[in-house]
């Protein structure tokens, strides 16, 4: 018996956890539904808590370096303390609200290159090794996102890459500690003016703030630079607007200005991915995660889950 208790403390013969999602596809503002299925081990187990949380890969800039970390940004308790008998089977239903700002991972039925998202289940076991499970999740765009992305495609822009950048865009009300950048190669009719465009959605229950960063080409006597535009759109406009005309107007207005939205974060201004100008990094108030104590959104869990993410998303 003592030997079994010792093995259980190291996770041998302990309880197992497997989360089954009713549907792994969702959208910002909706829910993820499923069941956490438990099976008891060789000995009774005291479960302290069961939680589910959304995790994703985020680009983190520090000085002159940049690295990717895996971050849990939204968590919910599924169950409090309970006792699990040997070999007992238990299924616990849950419904996890998906934050409005959750980044989009899939468009037109395809995973965006550079994006990854998962639902992590954690089983906290008293006096034993905690157990966990990780399930792939696909976050699809809302109608307002789709209309704007459709307009970029109709205008001839080609998708390049998407990623998440740690930080907050100054002047924008964010609840998550990162923002998504969807990058496009310039359409032919804009190629003489800009090289690339980065599109950011910051979504709320009322609508979406659209942030554009245009990498402007330099002229014979002028250097290239970044230009920024910011536009607020209600969800109700999704189906009653000529989005091709609107997005074209946004781009022309944005490229006519020079860095009007730029605001410095902590430290000297730095280039996005270190390759040009002051970039979106200049707009970002790059508050270090964890400054707001106890904020689940700021929990980096790279070491525990880097291996688990290798099978999906990624580059």
Question: Language model features by range: what are they?
Answer:
Residues 154-223:
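Extended serine/threonine-enriched, polar tracts that run as long, contiguous segments within proteins
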Residues 1-11:
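A eukaryote-biased signal for short, well-structured alpha-helical docking elements
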Residues 41-48:
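A short beta-turn/strand-edge loop motif at beta-sheet boundaries
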Residues 55-68, 217-223:
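Short aromatic-acidic-glycine turn motif
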Residues 75, 124-153:
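Short beta-strand elements
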Residues 66-109, 129:
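A beta-strand/beta-hairpin structural motif
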Residues 269-314:
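Short, low-complexity, glycine-enriched hydrophobic/amphipathic alpha-helices that associate
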